[in-house]
Amino acid sequence: VSDLDANSLEAPIAIAVLTHIVRSIVDDADAVAVTSGPGKGDKILLEVRVGPGDLGRVIGRRGRTAQSIRTVVRAAATNDDVDVDVDFVDA
């Protein structure tokens, strides 16, 4: 049994920051979709879907771009008083 309710799965600032960053990186900004759901423990999982061919651009060389995005979004999530994990998925 989890003590999380539906309202605690919201991270509007983190989602807005994540969406803005990813849309500025990819070629097809309209194909970017961010969904949120329960993650491990008390974390919220933010799943990013990008258009075909854009996943490599978001992940970057050796995953450095993806790791940087995760770091910035986790910092933004502190304004939402939540912990987040970010996963990148090819649509």
Q: Would you name each region that the model predicts?
A:
Residues I59-G63:
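Glycine-centered tight-turn and secondary-structure capping sites
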Residues V1-L55, Q67-A91:
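RNA-contacting regions in translation and RNA-metabolism proteins
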